[in-house]
């Protein structure tokens, strides 16, 4: 069948799907998210986190690495969050650390999203041995805690943002792949997919233009949860002393507080509060999105 014939036939079949207009569908989904208290709270927390990250140089003009006060000074008007063991302003550290932590989480999510979506689409549509291989791979990663795998890699090759991103990304994609596979399996025999196959559409076209739009909502929920998991993992590595000492992040600040928990509570409380707010933002939005999509 010629491409023009395929396109015209596809256009004739499109109304039968009863798919809402994409802009209207997006608006209704956003409205459903904001109608829930968790969605509103998550959006407020997310906007707060993003504003702090992007406006860090204007919100905290003090160099986070400058020795600007008395070491281990409690919160005062001069240093609203106190100072660390070297006399550096903790507020500047928390504000500037937001950018690095969010960039790490975004990079990990991008790696996991690219790998998980592509593999899940192929495995779900093709099945067979690929399906068995994905199941075994996922079980392997689930049997070994992610934090343990990352800690082993960092212990062997040394700390670094690139190693952290690659390790977290490559250990996070199996979960996304399973979600995508499950969604593809539930729609691969739908009428609109069978119609596309009957019209001669290629497997690549079906996977990326027909099946992918149907799995994106579920993927968005998983990515939101993944952001929170990455932030928590990065903070845990920092607390264990496995963070990158050359990158100012919330995890590094939490790690620096380890030896002063009894005498300087603010060193752990304020970075921990920032991490909690960011994790809540992504988890609450993911929960609201899942509810808006009917629990998919």
What residues fall within each predicted segment?
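C-terminal transmembrane helix and the adjacent membrane-cytosol boundary/short C-terminal tail
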Residues: 161, 170-171, 217-227, 265-296
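Generic hydrophobic transmembrane alpha-helix motif, especially the helices
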Residues: 80, 84, 124-125, 130-186, ...
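Transmembrane alpha-helices
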Residues: 99-115, 150, 154, 204-234, ...
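Periplasmic/extracellular loop-to-transmembrane helix junction in inner-membrane transport proteins
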Residues: 22-37, 62-109, 252-272
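N-terminal signal-anchor/first transmembrane alpha helix
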Residues: 17-65, 137, 215-216
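Glycine-rich helix-loop "coupling/hinge" segments at transmembrane-helix boundaries
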Residues: 153-156, 184, 232-274
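Transmembrane-helix boundary motif in ABC transporter permease subunits
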Residues: 56-59, 104-139, 151
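Short helix-to-coil transition segments within interhelical loops
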Residues: 83-88, 125-126, 195-214, 254
